Amino acid sequence: MSACALLAGGLPDPRLCAPARWARSPPGVPGAPPWPQPRLRLLLLLLLLPPSALSAVFTVGVLGPWACDPIFARARPDLAARLAAARLNRDAALEDGPRFEVTLLPEPCRTPGSLGAVSSALGRVSGLVGPVNPAACRPAELLAQEAGVALVPWSCPGTRAGGTTAPAGTPAADALYALLRAFRWARVALITAPQDLWVEAGRALSAALRARGLPVALVTTMEPSDLSGAREALRRVQDGPRVRAVIMVMHSVLLGGEEQRCLLQAAEELGLADGSLVFLPFDTLHYALSPGPEALAVLANSSQLRRAHDAVLILTRHCPPGGSVMDNLRRAQEHQELPSDLDLQQVSPFFGTIYDAVLLLAGGVARARAAAGGGWVSGATVAHHIPDAQVPGFCGTLGGAQEPPFVLLDTDAAGDRLFATYMLDPTRGSLLSAGTPVHFPRGGGTPGSDPSCWFEPGVICNGGVEPGLVFLGFLLVVGMGLTGAFLAHYLRHRLLHIQMVSGPNKIILTLDDVTFLHPHGGSTRKVVQGSRSSLAARSTSDIRSVPSQPLDNSNIGLFEGDWVWLKKFPGDQHIAIRPATKTAFSKLRELRHENVVLYLGLFLGSGGAGGSAAGEGVLAVVSEHCARGSLHDLLAQRDIKLDWMFKSSLLLDLIKGMRYLHHRGVAHGRLKSRNCVVDGRFVLKVTDHGHARLMEAQRVLLEPPSAEDQLWTAPELLRDPALERRGTLPGDVFSLGIIMQEVVCRSAPYAMLELTPEEVVERVRSPPPLCRPSVSMDQAPVECIQLMKQCWAEHPDLRPSLGHIFDQFKSINKGRKTNIIDSMLRMLEQYSSNLEDLIRERTEELELEKQKTDRLLTQMLPPSVAEALKMGTPVEPEYFEEVTLYFSDIVGFTTISAMSEPIEVVDLLNDLYTLFDAIIGSHDVYKVETIGDAYMVASGLPQRNGQRHAAEIANMALDILSAVGSFRMRHMPEVPVRIRIGLHSGPCVAGVVGLTMPRYCLFGDTVNTASRMESTGLPYRIHVNMSTVRILHALDEGFQTEVRGRTELKGKGAEDTYWLVGRRGFNKPIPKPPDLQPGASNHGISLQEIPLDRRWKLEKARPGQFSGK
């Protein structure tokens, strides 16, 4: 293209370009001849026309991952696009049209960069072919429409024409759907390669298939892209819903796709290539593979892959006989349209797809101009005419409002050639036999088929079941439902009974669950019918001293290790528990509050021991046991001093318990001080709630209550015995008021009236006058006495609710907590504060020690490894693609050790390694270990740093070498300390080894080579391998190296090695390597450098060993 300024749409600015021809123009070009009018009118017309109207060159951009995907690059897009443009420009039919030029545009392989590539491309071209990444398709459509550029996508499943966007070059989704419909394979799974391009293609394809009604069961990614990742992906397919076909969204193995090779090999290993699944490659839909006698090398070289590929069906573009991609490539090369040195066997068939896309775009331009009479046309007009354009494609005629035909290719397990089985027309959805049937693995049939309803538009498929089977199943379900309805009632009650008599939530208790105790003194019958006062007076030690007894009708026992109380039902002929009783008790068992006694179960047992008559059946409610007895008993014990705080605490507990019951809609009906019990913490709890309801459900006749029991009963209940049995909420409030009188006065109800219980009950039942207790004003706060009298109101509606009573009572106590143990808590508050301060100090000391421990641990192991070991999680070995290792040792260390005391050797190494440790702190390196005089450092692990590892190690080595030049031993300062340094770069594996004193160790040939570089080095020299030198030169940071020459490395052979002698800008002094005498050792110290006294000592210790040196 000429050097003209480009405007939007990629067309030249008419003010800067001199067009070659004006009679015919590309899209947007009016084809009128020069206007024979005054120059001013012509200039005005030129300024009013769009810029693209004045261009004689139509630039086609071909966008794809040519630079980052080698298989796409093998399509030689530059040659394909130029070949198409050259043929278009030579076409006589297009002589009056624009000149076509092509430009190759790179598309990143990662999704985040695709949109930027599209945006950049639209500003440089008149028409665009691409993008490849489906994630950029929709944004590309919008950007192309805004820029007025015709867009021809070639790899966007589900893309519809519209605006400036033409239909996809290859209808991949339509063709694949037609194939699945022909074989009735509705349930499919998609496995994609891990690259962004294929992941997005899988998502777009699954959305397109689901939009057509197919149940895509799974879309998964093969990560990592090796055999292990393939196995995991196939296991997910196995574990998911049943599928018929697996669509492989990745490069075909026939083009060198390693992911598909691993996937097919894994399928063969897992037994999935046996015909139970069919594997369909996705990428072959975008180019043409042709059957023929030529053997496929990738199948011929691997018998396992050949067997696995037998389960693959390839749907690809159809080429006419003699017109395959390879045939056309040969003809183009023979006509010198392609370079003669081009290896056609290495060219991907995607070559033809690129060629066809450029021709389709050119055909759309020609038809659009023809329809406009040679006048100006927009990008949308070009895109609209592309489907109708009929052009000679690279593999047959394209366009003409018909989708290209496809062919279904197959192989067999014994051969390595492709043969055609069916011809597929996506437009009609027809499948015509090509003469050879499909060969399924092991000679079996297809992997089955799904109901045809999946492929019928507007029909909701019933999970893959035929309608007749659905109707039959419906009748069967109805029949089973009717049969089950007769069993449901029985099974429900049976299961409920099982749950009640077994398991952790059972409520039916027997002699196996409850252990009864015979109390000291008194007969059995007396204990059963007595109050809780006799049991409350017993100590724990007294109860535990009594041996276990058989059932003796006692009211106390042991259940699951806790004391329990049994409230016995009247009568002794209880054989079974009625279902209504179980239901009622289950609801009562759900009541849980700190001031309500917890019901644990229903005890049903038959006696024969303990004096009970044969056939006797005991039924009782088992509840938690409160050791201090009832409130009535507590008030009767005069040796217990009760102040107002104690009394208010008891009353507040009673009010809270009753408020909870009323909130749950439970009317007590039998509330009295004998039904209020106190536990060992002096917490009052309400008991016997719902007892009348249980009696009624069990159909037990209640004996008429005595006058003494009716002293707490409200007047309206005394007048209605039926209402008295059920109880009411206002009646409970009246009973509460009587209990308040008991607690305040510490006397029996109505004790101050000097009347018998019968007389009191009669006067309360039949006023006037009203019969109520009399309470002195000095016995309680005035507000409490007024609240008490409100509870005694004759009319039920005038009595306050429990919520109102609770609020009033709290105001009487001015919001203070009145629990009896609060006093003891206040006494411990000061001690608690002091204890908190002490704990805080100890915690701070512990945190300091923990920090010290963590600091020490991170000095021994990498922080990530240290954290994993502290958490107790295993540390998996990690592979590092490229690191640089440093090895160094002290020249003549054995001689120095022989001349030194052990403590002097330790001091030497400590001083030297302390110097090294200070230096490595300023570099991005990790100290691996020290063994004797050997010092090992690595960079690039455990934290990767790109290629910086070589520079970090090289800088550190220069710093260490400079520092060693001025280092002196404390015990032999006149003896120089010379070190040898070896560097090498390469891959390695790092991991933690051992459980006791675990070490972070490195493994691999890189470690051995780095050690060999050190051992073959020279004093005061940094010996560097070619791998490290290559990285240092790539970093271009001015590192200076010298060629040492060929060096024999143990186990590696002779290699070219180098000396690292400096770096640009490195001004620190570096010690001069000593001159080597012929025949002298490179790995020791000469005797002339050893002081006489030390030399004499060494000769004395090893006579004759150094005499010749």
From Swiss-Prot:
Record flagged with keyword tRNA processing: no
Activity regulation text: Activated by GUCA1A when free calcium ions concentration is low, and inhibited by GUCA1A when free calcium ions concentration is high. Negatively regulated by RD3; RD3 inhibits the basal and GUCA1A-stimulated guanylate cyclase activity.
SUPFAM superfamilies per the UniProt record, alphabetical: Nucleotide cyclase, Periplasmic binding protein-like I, Protein kinase-like (PK-like)
Post-translational modification: There are 9 conserved cysteine residues in sensory guanylate cyclases, 6 in the extracellular domain, which may be involved in intra- or interchain disulfide bonds.
Residue ranges of domain Protein kinase in the record: 492-810
Pfam hit, one: PK_Tyr_Ser-Thr
Glycosylation-annotated residues: N301
One GO CC annotation: plasma membrane
Topological domain ranges for the Cytoplasmic compartment: 492-1109
Segments on the Extracellular side according to the record's topology features: 56-466
Compartments it resides in: Photoreceptor outer segment membrane; Endoplasmic reticulum membrane
Main location: membrane
Catalyzed reactions per annotation: GTP = 3',5'-cyclic GMP + diphosphate
Expression (tissue specificity): Expressed in retina. Low expression in cerebrum (occipital lobe).
Leader sequence residues: 1-55
Oligomer status and interactors: Homodimer; requires homodimerization for guanylyl cyclase activity. Interacts (via C-terminus) with RD3 (via C-terminus); promotes the exit of GUCY2D from the endoplasmic reticulum and its trafficking to the photoreceptor outer segments. Interaction with RD3 negatively regulates GUCY2D guanylate cyclase activity.
Protein name per its UniProtKB record: Retinal guanylyl cyclase 1
